[in-house]
Amino acid sequence: MAETKSAPIFRNRVIDKKQLKKLIGWTFAHYGTAKTAVVADDLKALGFRYATRAGVSISIDDLKVPGSKAELLESAEKRIQETEDRYTRGEITEVERFQKVIDTWANTNDELTDRVVKNFRESDPLNSVYMMAFSGARGNISQVRQLVGMRGLMANPQGEIIDLPIKTNFREGLTVTEYIISSYGARKGLVDTALRTADSGYLTRRLVDVSQDVIIHEVDCGTSRGLFVEAMTDGDRILIPISQRLLGRVTAEAVLDPSTDEVLAEAGQDINEDLANRIEKAGIKKVKVRSPLTCEAARSVCQKCYGWSLAHAQMVDMGEAVGIIAAQSIGEPGTQLTMRTFHTGGVFTGETARLLRAPVAGTIKLGKKARTRPYRTRHGEEALLAEANFDLVLEGKGRKETFAILQGSTIFVQDGDKVAAEAILAEVPVSGRTKRTVEKATKDVATDLAGEIRFQDIVPEEKTDRQGNTTRIAQRGGLLWVLAGDVYNLLPGAEPTVKNGDRVEVGDVLAETKLTTERGGTVRMGEDNGSSTHREVEIITASVVLDTATVKAEASQGREHYVIETKGGQRFNLLAAPGTKVTTGHVVAELIDSRYRTQTGGLLKYSGVEISKKGRAKAKQGYEVTKGGTLLWIPEETHEVNKDISLLNVEDGQLVEAGTEVVKDIFCQTTGIVSVTQNNDILREIVIKPGDVHVLDDPDTAAKYDEGRLVNAGEEVFPGLTAEQLVWAEAVDGTDGPLLLLRPVQELVIPDEPPVPSQDSSQESSSRSIRLRAVQRLQFQDGERIKSVEGVDLLRTQLVLESEEGSSQLSADIELLPDSKDPETLRLQLVIIEPVVTRRDVASDTTHGSTHTELRVKDGQKVKPGAVIACTQIQCKEAGVVRGIQEGSEAVRRLLVERERDCVTLDLDVTAATQLQPGSLIVAGTQLVDGIIAPESGEARAIAPGQLQLRIARPYRVSQGAVLHVEDKGLVQRGDNLVLLVFERAKTGDIIQGLPRIEELLEARKPKEACILARRPGVAHINYSDDDAIDIQVIEADGTQADYPVGPGQPLIISDGETVDAGQALTDGPANPHDLLEIYYDYFREQLGEDYEAALESLRRVQALLVNEVQSVYQSQGIDISDKHIEVIVRQMTSKVRIDDGGDTIMLPGELHELREVYNSNNTMALTGMAPAQFTPVLLGITKASLNTNSFISAASFQETTRVLTEAAIEGKSDWLRGLKENVIIGRLIPAGTGFKAYEESLLTDVDGGYEDRVYDDDLADVVIDDRAARSYTLNEGRDFSRSMTFAEGESMILDDGEELIDDSSASLRNLVDVDED
């Protein structure tokens, strides 16, 4: 731009942050970098100079609280008090009250904020707080509001709003309560920030990884495709105007002025600020521009499709790494996005509706056309709902105002009403957003006073769900009254001792519980702990004591245990510790007995011994002996080993002496014949069998003793040999021939009945007697081989607890008692105790009455079954009349005493006739007779002449569909839940917002509660069935119909008879992008009849959805990001297709390939008349796309390194080093910026090019260049670095095994013709 010496222009305006931005931007656009730097420098100097002179700082006097704050709060308090009164009178429900309170405070807060700003602007425009916040230097309006307005509503840890706002600001100071309430949100803010930075960083890393190889490689890809760009809106609001979205784009076709048909821009022209503004002024709604999404450049984006580089408002340079710029642009603002929004339940009306206020006082006229119906607002106010559009007229003094009322508006005035100025007339929904999505929510209502329930107009209905749970639901709404009274909870099993209508005084017994014993027995009192009422009472129903045996404590191996010694000298180990409980069948003690202990392992045979049938399935304790006899024991020593056979030092059948090393490190303890068991050259066991050895000559004898058998004393074993005692004869293979082994047999005698120490038992009734029984248990079965080197116990004698009665699960306590004659001696006693729990009398008792417990028995007393041990009484605390005992109902759990203070007596004029019936329910504020208004709500009682008694009561409004927790005439304590209100509230925006939403979009995750999408276009019909289920039928043009069942909790967003398109959402919720892509692809394939075009069109739709969704999240937080950055990322997510059937190409089903690659390959197939590949477009999340990139080095450095590298190695992949990351890893110059020029040629003459005759230099060019060398390559003398092999004349690229070296991408273009033409 030529500089002209013209007079400087003086602009007299406030320069704030926005103006500064504009100023520097303007300077940069017109004068370039150097001059802008000078201007910025001067501005900085100017700013600092004046900031220093002014000495701007915040002192406490700068925080000026507007004087009108007090009256604002007062009016809010008044409105809230009115709401509270309405609630107390039962005119509105708890939900409506809450909603009204929240909205009142929210509006007050906004109002106050406006006052604060106005106050500053009018009275003190140079206030430092005001200057800082409004110039954009520091702070914002919400922070100023907290400093000098009010802090406002806070949320609790669950994210619900607390209906008590912080009315003070930091200037006035907070109370302790307010301080604590603030800390919830403060803590949440800190935690969120910490998490956010990590999440945001990881998002940026994934974005960089997916787009790092997108570099501007060519000037123009020559595509005719493009995207339509229009302004981004949300209802009426324009989020991004079209001029802003067009800036720096290149037009795809000529732009014409709709009114004059003048050409505003040619095709292929880049749009600067002036042109963008002219297009917007001309009223053009959409313009077709080039976009990275439709660019046809291979593996990159071309200059024209990308447009301006936003850094310097010029066309982007060649070799610019636009992918990384895009990733950083999207990732950087990540930290500014809030993690979660508070889920408040429809805050402020201001967001979703416009309020119409009366400009002047006047009278309302609703025209003839007005069609309205009564409607209850969410604040419980009666209003009218407009059913059609009409005009509302306000006639004031000398002027007439007309308001357009849209269908769905809420009107707060009636025809003919007189209104004051600024009164709210109506709430008009913001157009485009009339269908606000709602969700079901519930709220519990607890009672504020104890008393008796009465239903008024409520019709309860019982509903049983599939699980058989019954809920009572209010079919019709109404009032639920709680009539005051003192409610006593009765203890389980308590019986009332009074009747309805009885008069009771303080201390009278209302109910009592008797504690009885079930079995009877001897009473034993616990320690007296000083409390007269509460002592542990135990009743011993049966006991057994070993009266002659003593118990001694013995220490062995540092541990103490008890031993029982009987008169007969037997010693038992006490297995159950004193103080523990044992059940029937449990072992209490075990005889210390060495008679049945063996020296080694061996073979066990029973002779005459019988064991109980029960114990056959080897019990843990062993087998119980039912009949005595003899055990025959044939000893043998068994070594179980697991070693190599080479370590064996003896042979099978060899005779060894005791102490021989049979296997390395294993010595035998007995003398005998060795028997070795081995398996696959691994030794399993070595058995040494002691006994007398005789050589056998006769094979028949050997066969006779093959299995082994018992030979009695005096019996002939074989001719010439007679057994002298009982032996076990067994034939073995010796080292030199067959041998007969006579093994000694030990005989162990078992008595039929083992001895039992004497015991003395006592029991209260024949039903329960217990005793100790001695049981002999064998550890092993008949014929069992015990493999062991050490000895084992064959038989154990145990004392077991037994009871006469069938009840197996009796538990007895083990106690040690000092003997009555000699206190030093301890005796073992087992007792069965029935515990009787007597109540502690605690003041803060749930019965909320005074309970009093007294014992009726003494220590040591014998009691019969059913005798009363103790008695607990509930005593009256305040005199009154008993009510609320429901006759004939199941056990009475509560009773009510109506006290004096639960009633009010009103004096009426004796003459005044009253229409009131006794028992009628009266709301506070009702006129009873002329001039007398009920001071409290209540139930009318005894009406004497001139007097009216009211029993105080509290009404609660119950809305229809609420869940009732109480019954009519039931009794409730204060704080009990009465009812669960079910209501609908507006969903606050998108529940998932900010980072999680962006992540969900870019990772292409399936949303949690996805909407239902129409698969085909048609007309929708909605059918409602009885159980709240909805069925949508879409009838297509040719009459076919598709059914879409809608689950509960999925709100519809279409109306009956509406025409729907393919892929349109039928219910509320985010769409699943994968389903959408599939629906579009199927639809367009049918419409267009061609796979490639259908894939492009379906991908284009999904791309547009993703770009707009990501944009809207950033916009909602007030962050501006250029569309092209998001488009670059989305391009990487939507460039691949999945092969369904490879046809005659070299692609395999299930592989992911670039869409363009498949298209080229299919064209080649079409030329040669072969079968093309069938494919489906896929949407990859950024992580998946990064792992599926062409470069395995880049993918491996991102995630799943081992898997990526193994797969690459198995597939024999080559990495052509096209991106930045792979070059950085290998240590080459990156192909961007100056390095791009050095690589440019190698990247353009790609292996994808044709295989024309090539002449190679004999000297190998060095492919690795460094930064210094790269700078010397200019654009025009680029050298080709892709030739890294030299060939002699006539040679082709042949490897030894006759395979040609080509990569996947070139394979598709080979035309299946031999290339070697030299």
UniProtKB/Swiss-Prot annotation:
The keyword Nucleus does not apply. GO terms for biological process: DNA-templated transcription. Its cofactor is Zn(2+). Binds 1 Zn(2+) ion per subunit. It catalyses: RNA(n) + a ribonucleoside 5'-triphosphate = RNA(n+1) + diphosphate. One of its GO terms (molecular function) is DNA binding. Keywords: DNA-directed RNA polymerase, Metal-binding, Nucleotidyltransferase, Transcription, Transferase, Zinc. GO terms for cellular component: DNA-directed RNA polymerase complex. DNA-dependent RNA polymerase catalyzes the transcription of DNA into RNA using the four ribonucleoside triphosphates as substrates. HAMAP family: RNApol_bact_RpoC2. Belongs to the RNA polymerase beta' chain family. RpoC2 subfamily. This is DNA-directed RNA polymerase subunit beta'. The gene is rpoC2.
